[in-house]
């Protein structure tokens, strides 16, 4: 693949240099604009499908990043993958230092593989759970309620 890419780059640079590189018009009637990224876009809605949550986590990393509310602040979610499991959206269905952190989504579940605690360094979820036990059945929310 690298060799193919290198050859294509050389070919493209040659056509650019000799002026034969073809131009392609933009179709203004079908183009769309995306809004500027904001921190609010990174707040996880656990009612979304697991695959959408995982894509959001990967797509918004490193900035603005994704997070969810936990006691003590916001937990940054850095890497994740779709997992098996079911429960109420946001419900912790696995919190085992040997297995990791799995949270139910609106459809499916999300295994958080790397995260960052408030004021901490990025770490894998297994290491996080060794120092910050989480009860299975805890429901993570977009924001912490102060009842």
Where are the regions that the model predicts?
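Active-site-proximal loop/hinge segments within enzyme catalytic domains
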Residues: 1-83
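An anion-binding loop in the catalytic cleft
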Residues: 46-147
């Amino acid at each position: 693949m690298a060799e193919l890419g290198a050859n294509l780059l050389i070919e493209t640079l040659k056509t650019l240099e000799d002026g034969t590189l073809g131009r392609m018009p933009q179709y203004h009637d079908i183009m769309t604009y995306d809004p500027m990224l904001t921190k609010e876009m990174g707040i996880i809605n656990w009612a979304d499908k697991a695959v959408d949550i995982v894509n959001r986590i990967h797509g918004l990393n490193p900035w603005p990043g994704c997070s969810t509310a936990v006691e003590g602040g916001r937990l940054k979610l850095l890497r994740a993958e779709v997992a098996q499991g079911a429960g109420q959206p946001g419900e912790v269905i696995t919190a085992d230092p040997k297995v990791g952190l799995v949270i139910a989504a609106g459809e499916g579940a999300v295994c958080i593989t790397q995260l960052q605690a408030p004021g901490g360094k990025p770490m894998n979820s297994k290491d996080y759970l060794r120092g910050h036990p989480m009860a299975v059945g805890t429901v993570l929310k977009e924001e912490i309620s102060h009842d």
